[in-house]
């Protein structure tokens, strides 16, 4: 089963034992935006994708669904 962008972000966040507010503070994003991205109500911007990739140390290809391996 292929995970959505938001599901991957949620899994990565939970792997680091962070709540949405903690992640928001670390990547300079609002908690509401993270919530909307995780549940699929909002598409991330390029800058958002870059922020998630840098913080979680994963490739953009993984997050956007081009590869199934985090790398």
Locations of the language-model features?
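Residue-level signal for the short linker/turn that defines the boundary of a DNA-recognition helix
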Residues: 7, 17-18, 44-47
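Short alpha-helical DNA-recognition segment
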Residues: 17-36
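A short, Lys/Arg-rich alpha-helix, primarily the initiator
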Residues: 1-15
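DNA major-groove recognition helix of helix-turn-helix/homeodomain DNA-binding modules
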Residues: 28, 47-62
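Short, charged recognition helix plus adjacent turn
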Residues: 15, 54, 62-71
